């Protein structure tokens, strides 16, 4: 099923018993996090808090949607897939678009035409009138404190916008960039835009600032998009394709956009809330600390200040929010689902890879386990280096374990068995110093710069060892079949 907006998706989830309305008054200050965390860990439904309340007990005017993508199944549904396993088909499409192959013949060429036609017909449709601009706050009427912005953890410094899709455009780019960056509330019209220097929005801003050092930089932040657009913003879309175009492909219909009232950026026409504004030259503020997806409070640092000049919204808008914390949290669940999208992308570049897994306990990207069909000595090390360098999503992966294709990468018992029986700690450990590392990783010696470790837990080939290698014990299939046949009679 395809969803034209967030409300469509909510209605479908509610119809299937996958969304729970909460009429009881609940505060965005800590209470929503407590409830959402319990529900997510129980693999429970999405939550619509209908009566969020302020500290003094008065009611906010808008409901809060939380735990929307709290299970991999709901992520798949949001991407238009029938199941999590079907997400690999989306990955295969992205792999083809990233590096299209010449057709192998007339039949192959014709088989690819429908896909190419679908993709290029998904250019966004720009409309003049949009639901997201039914209500407009401008000037003194702009007041972010009227929104039920979530305060997630006890030592968080302030409420935090967590599910905002930030829309930017670089001075030399035709298409816009969509990114999700947390934003600290510091005033009725002020947010801190915490984008790291390598992220798309930050790069657009840096390029603009070089050419226009004294000019305010236009930005829009979208809250409450349709699921295809939200998930398109966190998917490794090829540079030749816009996130809006990819969202249209997932949805099966063109993304409807509308121009912002105060700038030329285009935003989803059926979004719930849109913040329009600018980043003024040299205006920064100290951000944090905040509890993050690592399970720790992160360091403070200075980031640009986003001045909100206008808030537009639908009638009776829904505020979409989440929290981040020690896994599992909603980003970790997203990582589990998107893992299936990554596999075909890696296999396109490295056909020897049979599976790839980012354990959610590893903060969704800091550790990877890869299985492969090994073909020569040193092959596992090539795969390690390839994974670190091929997709920018894995630039911050600290640990990569490589195993043979007889090991299930999603079963820690098998992975640990391979590590402890097929590895020599000295020979089979790869250490790389002074590599890009997650800014939030306080374990690294220098902020943004640290080490990586690769563990080669594959069977060793001649040239890698001088010893006779062990043979894996395997059961006799005939005996196994015989015992299967009499198992019930044994009464065990």
Curated annotation (Swiss-Prot):
Catalytic residues, chain numbering: 292 (proton donor)
Q: Which domain of life is it from?
A: Bacteria
Q: What is its EC number?
A: 4.1.1.98
Major location (coarse) = membrane
How does this chain sit within the bilayer?
A: Peripheral membrane protein
Q: Which GO terms describe its cellular component?
A: cytosol; plasma membrane
Q: Which cofactor does it need?
A: prenylated FMN; Mn(2+)
Pfam families in the record, alphabetically? UbiD, UbiD_C, UbiD_N
Entry's Gene Ontology molecular function annotations: 3-octaprenyl-4-hydroxybenzoate carboxy-lyase activity; metal ion binding
Keywords (A to Z) from UniProt = Cell membrane, Decarboxylase, Flavoprotein, FMN, Lyase, Manganese, Membrane, Metal-binding, Ubiquinone biosynthesis
Reaction catalyzed: a 4-hydroxy-3-(all-trans-polyprenyl)benzoate + H(+) = a 2-(all-trans-polyprenyl)phenol + CO2
Provide the protein name.
3-octaprenyl-4-hydroxybenzoate carboxy-lyase
Biological source species = Neisseria meningitidis serogroup C / serotype 2a (strain ATCC 700532 / DSM 15464 / FAM18)
Name the gene behind this protein: ubiD
């Amino acid at each position: 099923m395809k969803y034209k907006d967030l409300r469509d998706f909510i209605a479908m989830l509610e119809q299937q018993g996958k969304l729970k309305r909460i009429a009881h008054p609940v505060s965005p200050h800590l209470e929503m996090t407590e409830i959402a965390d319990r529900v997510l860990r129980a693999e429970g439904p999405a939550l619509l808090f209908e009566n969020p309340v302020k500290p003094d007990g008065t009611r906010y005017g808008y409901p809060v949607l939380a735990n929307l993508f709290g299970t991999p199944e709901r992520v798949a549904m949001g991407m238009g897939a029938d199941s999590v396993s079907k997400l690999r088909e989306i990955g295969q499409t992205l792999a083809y678009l990233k590096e299209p192959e010449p057709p192998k013949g007339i039949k192959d060429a014709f088989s690819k035409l429908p896909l190419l036609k679908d993709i290029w017909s998904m250019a966004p449709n720009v409309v003049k009138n949009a639901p997201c601009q039914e209500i407009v706050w401008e000037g003194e009427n702009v007041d972010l404190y009227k929104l039920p912005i979530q305060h997630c953890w006890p030592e968080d410094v302030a409420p935090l916008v967590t599910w905002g899709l930030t829309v930017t455009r670089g001075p030399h780019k035709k298409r816009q960039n969509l990114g999700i960056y947390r934003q600290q509330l510091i005033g009725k019209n002020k947010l801190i835009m915490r984008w790291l220097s390598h992220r798309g929005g930050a790069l657009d801003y840096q390029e603009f600032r070089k050419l226009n050092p004294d000019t305010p930089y236009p930005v829009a932040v979208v809250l409450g998009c349709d699921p295809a657009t939200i998930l398109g913003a966190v998917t490794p879309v090829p540079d030749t394709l816009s996130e809006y175009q990819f969202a249209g492909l997932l949805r099966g219909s063109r993304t409807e956009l509308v121009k912002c009232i105060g700038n030329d950026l285009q935003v989803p026409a059926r979004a719930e809330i849109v913040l329009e504004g600018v980043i003024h030259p040299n205006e920064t503020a100290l951000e944090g600390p905040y509890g993050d997806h690592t399970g720790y409070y992160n360091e403070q640092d200075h980031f640009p200040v986003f001045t909100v000049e206008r808030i537009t919204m639908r009638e009776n808008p829904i505020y979409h929010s989440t929290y981040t914390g020690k896994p599992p949290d909603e980003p970790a669940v997203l990582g589990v689902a998107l893992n299936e999208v990554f596999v075909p992308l890696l296999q396109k570049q490295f056909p020897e890879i049979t599976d790839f897994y980012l354990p959610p306990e590893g903060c969704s990207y800091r550790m990877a386990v890869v299985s492969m069909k090994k073909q020569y000595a040193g092959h596992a090390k090539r795969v390690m280096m390839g994974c670190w360098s091929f997709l920018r999503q894995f630039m911050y992966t600290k640990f990569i374990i490589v195993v043979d294709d007889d090991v299930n990468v999603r079963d820690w018992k098998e992975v640990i068995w391979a590590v402890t029986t097929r590895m020599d700690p000295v020979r089979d450990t790869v250490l790389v110093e002074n590599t890009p590392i997650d800014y939030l990783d306080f374990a690294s010696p220098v902020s943004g710069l640290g080490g990586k470790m690769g563990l080669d837990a594959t069977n060793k080939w001649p040239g890698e060892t001088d010893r006779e290698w062990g043979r894996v014990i395997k059961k006799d299939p005939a005996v196994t079949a015989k015992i299967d046949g009499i198992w019930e009679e044994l009464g065990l």
